[in-house]
Each structure stands twice: as C-alpha cells, then as structure tokens.
C-alpha cells in the first residue's frame, strides 16, 4: 500500500468492482490503524507515496483496471519517473487487486510473470 490515506481516485471508482479488496472502508481503516500504531498515516515509511523516490532501484508495478489501488499504483509510477527512477507499469484489463496471480492458467498471469521475470533478468542478471 503506497498511500494509507485512501486519497486515490480508484478507492471510490473501483469500490465494489475489485473482487479481492472490495472497498476501502471500515475494515481497511481498522487494519491501517493497527499497522500505523498511532503514527501519522502520511509518514513516508508507512505511505511511500509521500516520500522522496530519488535513489529508488528500478521498479516494476503491476495492477488491474478494477484494482482498488490502481490510482495509487499510477501515482507511485509517476513519482518514480519524476525522480528519474526506471519504472515499468503493467495494468491488466478487468483484473482486481493481485488477481493476476490467482489463476495460474490465465493469460494475464503468464504475461505478468513473464514481464516480471524479464524485468528481474535485466536488472539482476540471469
């Protein structure tokens, strides 16, 4: 989670469309409160979107058009690029949060993992 404030557009537009996270509401708020343990939810150590992205390593981000966190993923991608970090964003049509890994036979799963493997091969070597 890159932004615990719930300020991303898709927290609203994809509510009830994301069949994994469903909606950012009371349950997520309670989990966020537990996770933050009283700290400011805008603290970059908790919500990296509010931090400095300079010096980050090359990054690959994966989301779906129905992902509750899609807008946050897009915002992180833009912030990484603005900081001069090589960043790749893959977005899969009709996919909910992390749905690409739930069905090993889905074409999106194969494509996601092929792209991720290729990204790691390029940056970490074979």
Locations of regions flagged by a protein language model:
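Alpha/beta-hydrolase superfamily serine-hydrolase fold, recognizing
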Residues: 1-126
């Amino acid at each position: 989670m890159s932004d615990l404030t719930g300020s991303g557009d898709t927290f609203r537009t994809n509510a009830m469309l994301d069949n994994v996270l469903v909606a950012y509401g009371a349950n997520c708020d309670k989990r966020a409160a537990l996770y933050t343990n009283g700290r400011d939810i805008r603290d970059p150590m908790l919500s990296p979107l509010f931090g400095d992205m300079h010096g980050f390593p090359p990054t690959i981000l994966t989301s779906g058009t129905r992902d509750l966190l899609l807008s946050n993923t897009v915002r992180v991608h833009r912030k990484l690029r603005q900081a001069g970090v090589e960043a790749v964003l893959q977005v899969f049509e009709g996919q909910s949060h992390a749905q690409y890994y739930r069905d090993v036979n889905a074409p999106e799963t194969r494509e996601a993992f092929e792209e991720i493997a290729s990204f790691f091969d390029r940056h970490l070597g074979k």
